[in-house]
Amino acid sequence: MVLNSNLTTQDKQRIINPIERTNVTQDLSENVILTTVDDLYDWARLSSLWPLLFGTACCFIEFAALIGSRFDFDRFGLIPRSSPRQADLIITAGTITMKMAPQLVRLYEQMPEPKYVIAMGACTITGGMFSVDSPTAVRGVDKLIPVDVYLPGCPPRPEAIIDAIIKLRKKISNESIQERDKIKQTHRYYSTTHNLKPVEEILTGKYLQSDTRSAPPKELAEAIGMPIPPALLTEKAQKEEQTRG
């Protein structure tokens, strides 16, 4: 590098080191935003939640009211999707049965990461009124898929659904990309276990072929003077009938 001899020492220093640390003034500090990739990523996802609506019972009626203009849930950026591959939030509303459980797990597995779950209603969380004597109701959807937000109620109001979405947004804003795969569900709702005893099949397929269906009852047959079928006679009555004959 060849420098002009007519330049002063200060000018030479500026040419050699053109980049210097600038003084941060009050005006400059108000125009600079410092953030991280995690914060930017979480901020972008806060207003772009696309829910997959999984309604199986009466709780879904309240969610249908939320879609209306009175509550306007579009202000949160929620766009209902019909395909799990386009959704990052699934809202389970209603009773989950044993037959429906594999389909729910399959829909959850088809959703891309990161994905979230809101359990809406008492029947989804603990089985509700079906958790006592129903052999087909699942005692809590968290036995099938991890739940991020529990929304109790029978059914919960649309205002409660909005509150659950706000709580989920707060959870998303505090997440990290590196720690997302390491987070696992630790706390679950208490739910009762099955206390039912297995019994033999009641419906054998031969109900119409039974003796009581092919012939009238014994009292009715005696009243109208019809011969009593042998199937309705006891051993003692059969012996008496034989001795008479």
From Swiss-Prot:
Keywords: 4Fe-4S, Iron, Iron-sulfur, Membrane, Metal-binding, NAD, NADP, Plastoquinone, Quinone, Thylakoid, Translocase, Transport. Residues 236-245 have a biased composition (Basic and acidic residues). Its EC number is 7.1.1.-. GO terms for molecular function: 4 iron, 4 sulfur cluster binding; iron ion binding; NADH dehydrogenase (ubiquinone) activity; quinone binding. Its cofactor is [4Fe-4S] cluster. NDH-1 shuttles electrons from an unknown electron donor, via FMN and iron-sulfur (Fe-S) centers, to quinones in the respiratory and/or the photosynthetic chain. The immediate electron acceptor for the enzyme in this species is believed to be plastoquinone. Couples the redox reaction to proton translocation, and thus conserves the redox energy in a proton gradient. Cyanobacterial NDH-1 also plays a role in inorganic carbon-concentration. GO terms for cellular component: plasma membrane-derived thylakoid membrane; respiratory chain complex I. NDH-1 can be composed of about 15 different subunits; different subcomplexes with different compositions have been identified which probably have different functions. Belongs to the complex I 20 kDa subunit family. SUPFAM superfamilies: HydA/Nqo6-like (SSF56770). The lineage of its organism: Bacteria, Bacillati, Cyanobacteriota, Cyanophyceae, Nostocales. It catalyses: a plastoquinone + NADH + (n+1) H(+)(in) = a plastoquinol + NAD(+) + n H(+)(out); a plastoquinone + NADPH + (n+1) H(+)(in) = a plastoquinol + NADP(+) + n H(+)(out). It is found in: Cellular thylakoid membrane. Residues 210-245 are annotated as: Disordered. Its main location: membrane. Binds 1 [4Fe-4S] cluster. PROSITE patterns: COMPLEX1_20K (PS01150). This is NAD(P)H-quinone oxidoreductase subunit K. It comes from Nostoc punctiforme (strain ATCC 29133 / PCC 73102). Pfam families: Oxidored_q6. It is a peripheral membrane protein. GO terms for biological process: aerobic respiration; electron transport coupled proton transport; photosynthesis, light reaction. InterPro entries: NADH_UbQ_OxRdtase-like_20kDa, NADH_UQ_OxRdtase_20Kd_su.
